[in-house]
Amino acid sequence: MKIYQIDSSARKDGSTSRALAKKLLDKIKKPEDEVIYRDLNDEMVFVSNLTESGMKIDPKDQTETHKKMFKLSDTLVKELKESDIIIISAPIYNYGPPATLKAWSDLAARVGETFRFKPNGRREGLLKNKKAYLVITSGGTKLNSNEDFLTPWLKFILNFFGIEKVEVVSADQMSLDYEK
């Protein structure tokens, strides 16, 4: 079995989401399992007008930025396709996802790779028979409240890719001081 662990917190040391994801990985991983690890802060290309336009031009006319974006996108898609279990750790930043996690989803959303258009025009996710664990943390936002835009967005993205089995592990409102 292959487990794909994705960390998105900008904080390398002292990150609660990273620590909880590591504990979860240690709990579910069997000795024979292979782990694919990706820290989204190590290398991420943000989709811009320049990179988005690269999707519409002939590969021979692409710039180095286009080529770098497609190389990373191909790698992210391959990692998703090869995995059986996906663990995504993410803190809530300003009520939503870290920018690197949004960039990851933009680069992983590829027609014919992670989703397709059916003849009726509706979309269908192509990454079936996978399970995802979302390790979501927050300082003040209560998860699954009207202020939490990360959890429903990430569930939607995974479902869009065809991943329907999603379990949330959460530690929210960790910075609130209830003694005051």
Where is each model-derived feature located?
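N-terminal beta1-alpha1-beta2 submodule of the flavodoxin-like/Rossmannoid cofactor-binding fold
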Residues: 1-90, 95-103, 110
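Short acidic/glycine-rich loop or secondary-structure boundary segments that cap or lie
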Residues: 46, 96-97, 142-144, 177
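Conserved nucleotide-sugar donor-interacting segment of glycosyltransferase catalytic cores
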Residues: 105-120
